[in-house]
């Protein structure tokens, strides 16, 4: 749209042609002649200079200024703050980012599965499976560019996770003989089960005790993770479903984290309560 001062918000899409950008600018009233803008872009090699995103532009800009403004860091890109709560699943996070016009859900899922992220905590054997990122999309408040590259949006979460994990945490994980994948898997179950911080360390202790005893964890939230629709309470039939995430039928940990835990759950995973209890009661 264009306001009374000739300013408009316009979106340059992901991997689109200069012709598409020219049409968007023309439709928004930013430029008068699509052909001239395309000619300028061709002569100045501007196609490689335009970054995808949503921009605040003015009818007062010439072609050179328009191209310069449609770049990351120009100050013209529209940003939005998004808060991700602890315990959100990857799918919930991606749906929220789509709702906030950051990236499309499909682009995010594709980037989650196929983009090469250089973090040692990710399971490289799961390349091609979006679930490899489950648990590592650290819940926090982020500022995103609207319409930014999906891989760049995801990298914000992963970099934040990387920065939150301290040397002390890594040392504790090593002492317990746990990979970061296992730590986050346990933390994700704690995140979904705990009603308050006081319960987290107890839940961690019970998980470890049951695993050591060869008992199924019987954690409802692992089954809820794979159900097609959300349920507040499982039925007996739900506990019989055929899934590696069914911790009523299988022993050990589920194959991946079931949510993205916060720091309190990760710390509880590494510092469980001193108890051999096999059960916990939730408030």
Identify the residue ranges that each predicted region occupies.
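Signal peptide-directed extracytoplasmic domains
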Residues: 1-164
């Amino acid at each position: 749209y264009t306001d009374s001062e000739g300013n408009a918000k316009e979106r340059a899409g992901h991997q689109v042609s200069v012709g598409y950008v020219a049409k968007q600018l023309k439709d928004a009233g930013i430029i008068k002649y699509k052909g001239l803008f395309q000619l300028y872009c061709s002569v100045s090699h501007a196609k490689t200079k335009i970054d995808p995103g949503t921009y605040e532009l003015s009818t007062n800009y010439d072609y050179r200024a328009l191209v310069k403004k449609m770049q990351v860091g120009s100050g013209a890109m529209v940003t939005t703050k998004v808060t991700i709560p602890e315990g959100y699943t990857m799918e919930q996070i991606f749906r929220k980012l789509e709702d906030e016009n950051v990236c499309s859900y499909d682009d995010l899922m594709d980037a989650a599965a196929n983009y090469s992220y250089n973090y040692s905590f990710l399971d490289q054997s799961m390349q091609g499976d979006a679930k490899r990122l489950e648990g590592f999309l650290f819940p926090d408040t982020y500022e995103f560019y609207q319409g930014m590259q999906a891989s760049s949006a995801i990298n914000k979460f992963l970099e934040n996770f990387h920065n939150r994990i301290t040397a002390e945490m890594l040392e504790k994980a090593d002492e317990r003989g746990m990979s970061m994948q296992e730590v986050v898997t346990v933390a994700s179950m704690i995140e979904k089960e705990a009603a308050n911080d006081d319960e987290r360390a107890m839940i961690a202790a019970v998980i470890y005790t049951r695993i050591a005893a060869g008992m199924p964890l019987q954690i409802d939230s692992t089954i809820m993770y794979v159900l097609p629709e959300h349920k507040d309470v499982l039925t007996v039939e739900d506990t019989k479903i055929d899934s590696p995430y069914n911790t009523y039928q299988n022993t050990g940990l589920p194959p991946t984290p079931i949510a993205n835990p916060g720091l309190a759950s990760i710390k509880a995973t590494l510092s469980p309560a001193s108890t051999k209890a096999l059960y916990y009661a939730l408030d």
